[in-house]
Amino acid sequence: MQTLIIDGQDLYGQKDLHDYLAKALGFPSYYGANLDALHDMLTSWQTPTTIYLVNLDALSEHLGAAYSKKFLKLLLDVEEKNAFLTILR
């Protein structure tokens, strides 16, 4: 079981978010660092993983409200499709 904490206070933009996820989850070098690429990676994820979301207000502030909302929706959508992922906030 893998555990990942996404702390909105530690991520200061979209690049930080995608760099963090790529490193923490061991994404391949061809990872596109955008929401479509993240969706593709997470829907095919095969390792039992729990992702904890903390400081969501800071995440929204740092990513921008619209991008943060899309990111959170993506995580919840992927959680429904992939039994290996659990999203907790």
Which residues make up each language-model segment?
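Positively charged, polar, low-complexity stretches
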Residues: 1-89
